[in-house]
UniProtKB/Swiss-Prot annotation:
Membrane topology designation: Multi-pass membrane protein
Protein name, as recorded: Probable UDP-sugar transporter protein SLC35A4
Residue runs in coiled coils: none
Catalytic activity: CDP-L-ribitol(in) + CDP(out) = CDP-L-ribitol(out) + CDP(in)
Keyword Lyase recorded: no
Gene expressing this chain: SLC35A4
GO biological process: transmembrane transport
Lumenal domain ranges by topology: 40-52, 107-140, 199-214, 272-279
Lineage, opening ranks: Eukaryota, Metazoa, Chordata, Craniata, Vertebrata
Length: 324
């Protein structure tokens, strides 16, 4: 199976080793986000504006891309690049920005546990757009693998971790902050459906752009993150009065920004040289990293639901990428 069909590059050689390392780093950085964010809490809350962290992350990615072009880590095109090729990335930035804001607004219409479980529907929406927009076909075996990924995510979100002081398992989001009553509203379900659709569309659309344009990945990322910085700068400025850009930041917060920036760059490489489906497996496998770090850093206990989720993920990987 080829890379563009959602598979892995050819086995053997240094290229395969680099690809494997990139996937492992992507999984680690994605899974570390929630535990690192929990370590930033002061008196049970994040002491800085979320928009500040997003803006600084986008700015860090932009600077790293510019640096890679300036020092020659990636070659600049032989002729002046057609800057009109930057315009399509504005839509990618807009879709990602809309998704980030929907996540915040969804918390007003449902509890974090319900959101964590239902948000796994974005796996299905990504697969749908992958087939429709890229004209790829998934076999029954591959479709079953993606269903197992959805089940694994829902299983882990429903109770993969437990606070030692609580008799009941909790979702990763509530295990560190305390229990929240389960609730969901009709507007919340509609917003969640919109979130899942935008999530799938943004991933597949960005993959299409990255693969269609014959430009260095760093230059494509430069286009994307320029729009991302402008969009998030506007959102931050329009967010009303609040803490300053760096107010409340600590060493842990800086690590969150750096890890998220690295993750964004790695994910773009995954989608250019792999696929949106590969990205789904990276995100799902990151649950294992999330759980292990939560247990080690936050003193949370792993439950049977976590081990079931890990088993389902392993089975899904075998079904999708294993020998036919």
């Amino acid at each position: 199976m080829s890379v563009e069909d959602g598979g892995l590059p050819g086995l053997g050689g240094p290229g395969q080793a680099r690809w494997t390392l990139m996937l492992l780093l992507s999984t680690a950085t994605y899974g570390a986000h929630a535990p690192l964010l929990a370590l930033c809490h002061v008196d049970g809350r994040v002491p800085f504006r979320p928009s500040s962290a997003v803006l600084l992350t986008e700015l860090t990615k932009l600077l790293l891309c510019a640096l890679s072009l300036l020092v020659g880590w990636q070659a600049w095109p032989p002729r002046t690049p057609p800057w009109r090729q930057a315009a399509p990335f504005a839509l990618s930035a807009l879709l990602y920005g809309a998704n980030n804001n929907l996540v915040i607004h969804l918390q007003h219409y449902m509890d974090p546990s319900t959101y964590q479980v239902l948000s796994n529907l974005k796996i299905g929406s990504t697969a749908l757009f992958y087939c429709l927009c890229l004209r790829r076909r998934l076999s029954a075996r591959q479709g079953l693998a993606l269903l197992l990924l959805m089940a694994a995510g829902a299983c882990y979100a429903a109770g993969g971790l437990r606070d030692p002081g609580s008799p009941l398992p909790e979702s990763p989001s509530t295990a560190a902050s305390g229990p929240v009553p389960l609730h969901v509203t009709a507007p919340g379900l509609l917003l969640l459906l919109l979130y899942c659709l935008i999530s799938g569309l943004s991933s597949v659309y960005t993959e299409l752009l990255l693969k269609r344009q014959r430009l260095p990945l760093a230059l494509q990322n430069l286009f994307l993150y320029t729009f991302g910085v402008l969009l998030n700068l506007g959102l931050h400025a329009g967010g009303g009065p609040g803490p300053g850009l760096l107010e409340g930041f600590s060493g842990w917060a800086a690590l969150v920004v750096l890890s998220q920036a690295l993750n964004g760059l790695l994910m773009s490489a995954v989608m250019k040289h792999g696929s949106s489906i590969t990205r789904l497996f990276v995100v799902s496998c990151s649950l294992v990293v999330n759980a292990v770090l939560s247990a080690a850093l936050l003193r949370l206990q792993l439950t049977a639901a976590f081990f079931l989720a890990a088993l389902l993920i392993g089975l899904a990987v075998h079904l999708y990428y294993g020998s036919r």
